[in-house]
Design a protein with these regions (language model features):
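Glycine-/small-residue-enriched transmembrane alpha-helix faces in small-molecule transporters
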Residues: 1-30, 66, 70, 74, ...
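Hydrophobic/small/kink-forming positions within alpha-helical transmembrane segments
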Residues: 8, 65, 69, 73, ...
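C-terminal-most transmembrane helix of multi-pass membrane proteins
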Residues: 28, 32, 129-131, 205, ...
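Hydrophobic transmembrane alpha-helices of multi-pass small-molecule transport proteins
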Residues: 39, 62, 68, 110-132, ...
Length: 290
């Protein structure tokens, strides 16, 4: 629960920076660099882990970091066009996309529950796409496409973590650290080697940047690893439904976003589709361990 709630606070710390005129690449640069520094120090000083990696691991991590960073950019960019709760709910279709990608490229079977899940998620996305007074205008369409693009990129990242052999024995915390560290490359390039980096001129902005690196990034990633070990991946994934719910609550409570029947119904349909993916029977006839 803590993992999902922490990750769902992304908009809480990102939106004040967006409203202050800070660009998406600058926001994510601060998030990733603070997270990398804190995470690296934590691994080295507290966990006493070696940070050494092989050349094959380096190449794989660069590729994964690119996917992860682009997913972050598109998600945060979508906050500028549509409600944050809608953005995070659209992101939550990624388990369905993982199932489709795995079926197409790795010949995993699409059973009836997966097809039903995809239909449910698609209907939920359709309802969410019709929310708000400006539904259908260019701004809304752009935001929806950005959020869905973020979900696709994150799904590709998940598949990559699962399928890329060089990183199969890499500890989770080392994987997370290098994905964030190498992910900085995207923002450094987009900011023209930081010449376009916007400064943080108030304590509030510094606090938001630091908390963005700590709560929805480091704490979320660390508690996710612990949760999987304690209760298994299935229960952890089910509780992940609290992530878009948290984002919706943040949007309504802090940013005056409206909660309509379409948003509620779309949220339930998307989450239902995800739960069907998570708890569907495996090849041995039982749900995944957890």
């Amino acid at each position: 629960m803590l993992t999902a709630i922490c990750y769902g606070t992304n908009p809480l710390f990102a939106m004040p920076m967006i409203l202050a005129g800070i660009g998406t690449n600058s926001i994510l640069f601060y998030r990733y660099i603070f997270a990398s520094l804190i995470y690296g120090a934590f691994m080295k000083l507290v966990k006493k882990h070696s940070l050494r990696i092989s050349l094959r691991e380096f190449v794989a991590l660069i590729f994964l970091a690119l996917l992860f960073s682009l997913s972050s950019i598109t998600l945060f960019a979508s906050f500028r066009y549509i409600d944050v709760g809608v953005s995070c709910t659209l992101l939550f279709v990624y388990p369905s996309l993982v199932a489709v990608i795995s079926a197409i490229f790795f010949h995993e079977k699409l059973d009836g529950s997966v097809i039903l899940a995809i239909c449910s998620s698609t209907l939920g996305v359709s309802l969410l796409s019709l929310t708000g007074e400006s539904a259908g205008d260019a701004m809304s369409v752009r935001g929806i496409l950005l959020a869905l693009c973020s979900a696709l990129l994150y799904a590709l990242y998940i598949v990559g973590v699962k399928q890329m052999k060089p990183i199969q024995r890499l500890p989770n915390d080392k994987l997370n650290f290098y994905v964030m560290l190498f992910g900085l490359i995207v923002y450094v390039c987009n900011l023209r080697f930081c010449s376009d980096l916007q400064g943080l001129h108030t304590p509030l902005l510094w606090g938001c940047a630091l908390l963005l690196a700590i709560i929805p990034t480091i704490i979320s990633l660390e508690t996710l690893t612990v949760a999987i070990k304690l209760i298994g991946s299935t229960r952890t994934s089910i509780l992940g439904a609290l992530e878009p719910l948290t984002a919706i609550i943040v949007g309504v409570a802090f940013f005056g976003e409206q909660l309509s029947w379409r948003i509620c119904t779309g949220f339930l349909l998307v989450v239902s589709g995800v739960l069907l993916i998570i708890v569907r029977p495996r090849k041995n006839g039982v749900a995944s361990q957890g």
